[in-house]
Amino acid sequence: MIYVKYIILGFIMGSSLNLYAANNDIIANKEVIKVEVSNEHLKTLNEASTLLISCVDFRLIDETDKLMKQLGLDDDFDKVSLPGASLALVNDKYTYWGKTIEDTIGILQQLHNIKQIVFLDHRDCGAYKMLVGQEHLDTREKETAAHAEILNKARNLIKEKFPQLKVYTFLMGVDGVVEQIYEDVTLSSVIP
């Protein structure tokens, strides 16, 4: 806290430093950092039951971890984050994202013996706005339908390529409310 105050004082005194550069210097100057291990047993674990595929959005990092804990998967999941989560797997513009997810699943089946995939999409997603289009997301109903269609497409692709894995799909609101999206949702051909 004192260091931050010093940086702010530097601004007040007319220093040419900017907060962004100062923050980067703080990070760059850390050569060794000791991070507290959350659970001692983590050192002995070599399997994770689940791969979580979620969006990169910084707004929901803590909420995502809380969800996984509520699902009983705390300390029992690997994680891949790409823009749009399920959209990353099935979009036509950035196909290498899908390849990355598929390769990761294959590797984690061997390394950690994963048994299931959890896709976690979220509302107000920038990747969906860019790749699906705002016109498909401008009401809550349309947004739910767009996510449901893409989540189900992702589920079907995983089941086709990795039939032994269970797939669960969820949609999180920026308010933290999470809805499970089931296979029987009627699709509306949102994907361009």
Curated annotation (Swiss-Prot):
- Does Signal show up as a keyword for this record? yes
Keyword vocabulary terms for this entry: Signal
MF terms (GO), sorted A to Z: carbonate dehydratase activity; zinc ion binding
Query: Where does the signal peptide begin and end?
Result: 1-21
Asked if Signal is a keyword of the record, the answer is: yes
Alphabetized InterPro entries for the sequence: Carbonic_anhydrase_sf, Pro_CA_2
Source taxon at top rank: Bacteria
User: What positions belong to coiled-coil segments?
Assistant: none
List the protein's name. Answer: Uncharacterized protein RF_0129
Q: What is the native source organism of this protein?
A: Rickettsia felis (strain ATCC VR-1525 / URRWXCal2)
